[in-house]
Amino acid sequence: MAGHSKWANIKHKKEKTDAQKGKLFTKLGRELMVVAKMYGPDPETNPKLRDVIAKAKANNMPMDKIMGFIKRAAGEIDTTGYEDITYEGYGPGGVAVIVEAMTNNRNRTAGELRHIFDKNGGNLGQTGCVSWMFSRKGVIVIEKESFPDEDFVMEKALEYGAEDFTSENGIYEIITSPEDFSKVREGLEKEGFTFIRAQIEMIPQTYVKLSSEDAQKMRRLIDMLEDNDDVKEVYHNWEEDEE
């Protein structure tokens, strides 16, 4: 379905291994420290930090660990030179791929990502080559099992300014404009909702199907990109088969 994130298209989320969780927490921890160091360690006065905290909580990072990273940022840790960079390219079968990274060495990161694309039947492209195929939106995902009253969830989401609400495959997916994301998320938090995903994403406007051979290459490409230490998020318009 066009205009919805991958959550609405995949019935079963794969459980992350302990190693994957550890790597994810390391990346989120670095993001927390950099944002806290650059814009201040108080979430009340740092909206960027509030958004990263929400993202970390949605990925099951314990609050004491989140606060530990923020406290470290107030110390002597060096976060200079880090910047957010977005890379664009193509996977096998012409799949559009967007990679969001945080790096302190853009040449190193670009070289590593180019190698990963080349190795898996894709190529790293120029800025703007595929981003026009995506829409930047806030995405909030809630498990139905935790909050079975669908009408109430939808009512509250729309009340706080959500653009769209869908209910399928055991989840509610709430879409917001990037500008209203924090307002909607914080409003729903005050109502007592918890999220399994809460962040601003690039959502494909159309999806591409792949042959089984290209699908294997694409899965490998995504896994290798996500495994890279500098990569925060990978977005694509491959229509994965439901398992």
From Swiss-Prot:
GO terms for cellular component: cytosol. The keyword GTP-binding does not apply. The keyword Transcription regulation applies. It comes from the Bacteria. It is found in: Cytoplasm. It holds the Pfam family Transcrip_reg. One of its GO terms (biological process) is regulation of DNA-templated transcription. GO terms for molecular function: DNA binding. Keywords: Cytoplasm, DNA-binding, Transcription, Transcription regulation. Coiled coil: none annotated. SUPFAM superfamilies: YebC-like. Belongs to the TACO1 family. HAMAP family: Transcrip_reg_TACO1. This is Probable transcriptional regulatory protein Athe_0816.
